[in-house]
Amino acid sequence: MKTAWTRRSFLQSAALATATVITIAACGGNNQSSSGGSGQPVEVTLVSYAVTQAAYEQIIPKFAAQWKEKTGQEVRFNQSYGGSGSQTRAVIDGLEADVVALALESDINQIEKAGLIQPGWQQRVPNNGIITNSVVALVTQEGNPKGIKDWTDLTKPGVRIVTANPKTSGGARWNFLGAWGSVTQTGGTEEQALQFTTDIYKNVPILAKDARESTDVFTKGQADVLLNYENELILAQQKGEKVDYAIPPVNINIQGPVAVVDTYTDKHGTRKVSEAFVQFLFTPEAQAEFAKVGFRPALPEGVDPQLLAPFPKIQTWFTVADLGGWAKVQPEFFGDGGWFDKVQQAVAGR
């Protein structure tokens, strides 16, 4: 059926992009010019996660034109897109990014711990470094035959859910935290959250290793619900795909951070232009481009209200900070013996 093939085509290609690093040069030319002089071109290397590429294809030319007008200098961008976790490891292993825009604050914190980003990076930019927002969406098979609308529907007998293992997938961590917080952020206790999340994961026959495998399972009809990012589904619809999904009214704010990689900007002599680019990402002009491809703007002030209209209202929108922050959440939820392990133990006991 054409609709089913189209849906599979988009979702599988999106998952593949998240698993594969693709490097694109915005313009030709070899690096080693400093951002200090207005005559020579300067190159900036941006490393980001896959689903942001469509936005940066619009944002980068706007910034380049603005920089040229202000300084008289041409700026060229080398861009690398892939899964946030793999991009993080690549930078730590030697991919010399001037700017990183990743899916998790904890990913940037890993780069900081490797000594490449100076502590306090969140405080050196607006909005604590967060440039995009999104929420968890519940993708259903065509027509939503199981009537999935909210987190509680995931506990129904006979509902088959596919999500990745949060120990190996950053996106799956958001899914787990979204389900957990739907209890604790509405007055429930940790014990109640443990039971509720366990009931959900009892309906997850097999934990996929990553987003690609999760999507493969769903598109083959082996699951009723796929947990995914809202922005990816909006982008799919913009491309003409038919995707059925629901947005739980109690949801987690999936925040995308950005940071300058101090070690490499100093090495390349690109600090001034890199910092200017990061600042540009918080402007209404850049925020509008993120909104156009499905992200909820982190700073909606000044963004055309028509771009904000399609986003369903979230009744209770909580953040990782509400759960204690990544420094606490990572070990308590996903470390050895953490809440996820407790859920798995309870599921195994069935």
Swiss-Prot record:
Read off the InterPro entries from this record: Sulphate/thiosulphate-bd_CS (IPR000957), Sulphate/thiosulphate_BS (IPR034408), Thiosulph/SO4-bd (IPR005669)
Q: What is its main location?
A: periplasm
Q: What is a single cellular component term in the Gene Ontology annotation? A: periplasmic space
* Secretion signal span: 1-40
Describe how expression is induced or repressed: By sulfur deprivation.
Q: What compartments host this protein? A: Periplasm
Segments passing through the bilayer: none
Fetch the CDD domains from UniProt.
Answer: PBP2_CysP
Which keywords has UniProt assigned to this entry? Periplasm, Signal, Stress response, Sulfate transport, Transport
The yes or no answer to whether the keyword Cytoplasm is present is no
A GO biological process of this protein is:
sulfate transmembrane transport
GO molecular function ontology, one term from the record: molecular carrier activity
Please report which protein family the annotation says this sequence is part of.
Answer: Belongs to the prokaryotic sulfate-binding protein family.
Q: PANTHER family under this entry?
A: SULFATE-BINDING PROTEIN
Task performed by this protein? This protein specifically binds sulfate and is involved in its transmembrane transport.
The protein in question is named Sulfate-binding protein
- This chain is encoded by the gene named sbpA
